[in-house]
Each structure stands twice: as structure tokens, then as C-alpha cells.
Regions:
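Conserved beta-strand elements of the Class I
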Residues: 43-45
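Adenine-nucleotide phosphate-binding core of ATP-dependent small-molecule kinases
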Residues: 103-120
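Glycine-rich phosphate-binding loop plus the immediately following alpha-helix
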Residues: 3-38, 47-103, 107
Length: 120
């Protein structure tokens, strides 16, 4: 087996996308699928600064999409007007989290919905 670093493709949004090393982490899943002798399709979440969602079909990485979610969360949580003046806490308000999930699925785009957190 030889590992050729990096993958390039189009994500679900149609935008160009790349993997630079994360594909090696998927070797374990591909090996596990092979050991199970399954043709099961798998959808993997690879959380991190740049979260990757990967579709594996018939033992092959078919498509992946990278999101800016981890880095965006870190920057908003550290430097934005959304958190300025609020006390720091590791507590997760599950109701607020659920509301955020519901809001994220509404029309209008991410940025207006983020700003609406200030007015709620």
C-alpha cells in the first residue's frame, strides 16, 4: 500500500475542496469496512478546526465537504460582539443549543442568524 497525500474534489455545495492529511485517518474506517466484508455506505464526521464530512461508498471516498465550523466557533466565542460582556462558562445550555440548531435550518443564511443572537 502506498499513501499519496491529499485529496481534491467538489463538496456537496459544489465548491472545490481539499484534504491534506486527514485522508490517512480514514484508512482505519476503510480497513474496518473491509474486515466486515460489507458494502455498507458510511457518512463520517471528522470534527476539528476545519470539520470534514466524508461519504464512503463501496469502500471508496466518494465525496467530502469541509466546513469552517471549528475555527468560526473559536473566533466567535473568543472575540465577537456576541460574547463580549458575557461571563465565561463551560456550561452548555441545551435549550439554547436546540434553538440554535433549529434557527440554523431556517432560510436567510448563517450571518443574519448569528447576529440575531444579540437581539433575542
Amino acid at each position: 500500500m502506498a499513501i499519496v497525500p491529499g485529496l481534491k474534489g467538489r463538496g456537496v455545495s459544489g465548491c472545490n475542496d481539499i484534504m491534506r492529511g486527514e485522508e490517512t485517518q480514514l484508512l482505519g474506517i476503510l480497513d474496518w469496512l473491509k474486515s466486515k466484508a460489507t458494502e455498507q455506505d458510511v457518512f463520517c464526521c471528522m470534527p476539528g478546526t476545519h470539520c470534514k464530512w466524508v461519504r464512503i461508498e463501496q469502500g471508496t471516498i466518494n465525496q467530502f465537504s469541509t466546513t469552517f465550523s471549528g475555527e468560526l466557533f473559536a473566533n466567535i466565542n473568543r472575540d465577537s460582539s456576541l460574547v463580549r460582556g458575557l461571563p465565561s462558562s463551560d456550561h452548555i445550555d441545551t435549550e439554547a443549543f436546540k434553538l440554535g440548531l433549529e434557527t440554523s435550518q431556517k432560510q436567510g443564511g448563517l450571518l443574519p442568524h448569528l447576529f440575531s443572537a444579540r437581539s433575542n
